[in-house]
Amino acid sequence: MFGTRFFAYQFCKNWLSKRPGLVFWSSVATINAMYQTRPLYCESVTKTIQQTYEGLVQKRINNEDELFLLGSGPRYVSFLSIHVYDIELYIQKKDVQTVHTILQKEVDPKLGLEMSMKDEEIGSRIVAALLKNEMKYAIKIVPTRNTNFSHLRGGFVRGLQSRMSQNDPAEQAAVSKFRSTFPVNRTCFKETALWMKLYGNDFCYIYKDSEIGHMHDENYMVSNLFLKGYLVGPRVNSEQARESVCLTLRRIMDGTLLF
């Protein structure tokens, strides 16, 4: 009438009923194992995704240790010479050898480095060659007083427009794209750095270790205009910054400063 399974079930039931403590701890262990297994699986996936994302952001934002300071100087505006911000120009250490090669080729030996950069044609050719060879750079802007991003953007755009070729629709489109992607609705506090970095073909804007915007810099047009604004021609945005940069570039060109 009753099979083997029935007697086995009855035996186990009677045996466990006399040992309630064992039943309790077995249940706790089972539940605990279930609880631990599920979060560990989710945590592992989340951690992997987070680390991958942070690694990509790290390359675009927190790569100051890969950068080398070329020079710095103050930016003054208006006939009153109001000191509005300090600028620092950086390149990646791995690009120093490339810079050396290009300067050796492009600088007019009769003029020297400084006068070559002051010559509109030669200086523009040097900057174009550096960008064509994928030199990556960063501009660090440190305001001397509280300001807003709208005011900074206006100054940057006017500087870019002053360097544009006449009737060049591609440059006009690039400057318009910069204007539309640069944030305006926030404050840039005194002595708090705003970075603008060229990463690949992306021109990124970084503030307080967060990317606040970027644009695709087609053919490095915006980068070219920015660098010319600080380095090329008889008048630049900061003569002291250009002098500082040229001192370093001269050492790189001479081979006395190589990594």
Curated annotation (Swiss-Prot):
Coiled-coil segments: none
A single GO molecular function term of this UniProt record: heme binding
Gene Ontology CC annotation, any one: mitochondrial inner membrane
InterPro entries: Chalcone_isomerase, Chalcone_isomerase_3-sand, Chalcone_isomerase_sf
Top-level division of the source organism's lineage: Eukaryota
Pfam families xref list: Chalcone_2
Gene3D superfamilies registered for this protein in UniProt: 3.50.70.10
Official protein name in the record: Uncharacterized protein C18G6.01c
Organism: Schizosaccharomyces pombe (strain 972 / ATCC 24843)
